[in-house]
């Protein structure tokens, strides 16, 4: 199964321990993790702006992000990075797009090369991927 993590999931995994961190670790171990340069760019911008008290945050992010297989970014639709990320993931036949973004979760799915890519929360992704219940 191919898994693409949205920027907010990567950020949570970088700064906080918990479910998102475990998702990154487990998906990296199973070599099913995908990402794009747009995620890295967005993550660095947010880490520098919102977490200046963590001077090595970008290095921590990069260390984890290296485990992901890269996919090409999409230039369109301009001005909507969320839609660009979903479109890029769907174009690469990703199975699960994992996000904490309520707007994106409301989309539910996206057409991909073969079938449909599910857009799910980190908790839903954990259940789908690892079949277990996660402690809150």
Label every model-predicted segment:
Residues 30-33, 93-96, 116:
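Short active-site oxyanion
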Residues 1-35:
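Short, well-structured N-terminal submotif of metal-dependent ribonuclease cores
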Residues 24-76:
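PIN-domain endoribonuclease scaffold, especially VapC-family toxins
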Residues 20-23, 52, 113-116:
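Glycine-rich, phosphate-binding/catalytic loops in enzymes
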Residues 9-10, 39, 84-85, 103-104, ...:
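Alpha-helix capping/helix-boundary segments
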Residues 12-14, 46, 107, 128-129:
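Residues that scaffold the ATP/ADP-binding catalytic core of kinase and kinase-like folds
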Residues 36, 79, 102-136:
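Acidic, PIN/NYN-like endoribonuclease modules and their adjacent C-terminal/linker elements
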Residues 64-110:
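Active-site neighborhoods of divalent-metal-dependent phosphate/nucleic-acid chemistry enzymes
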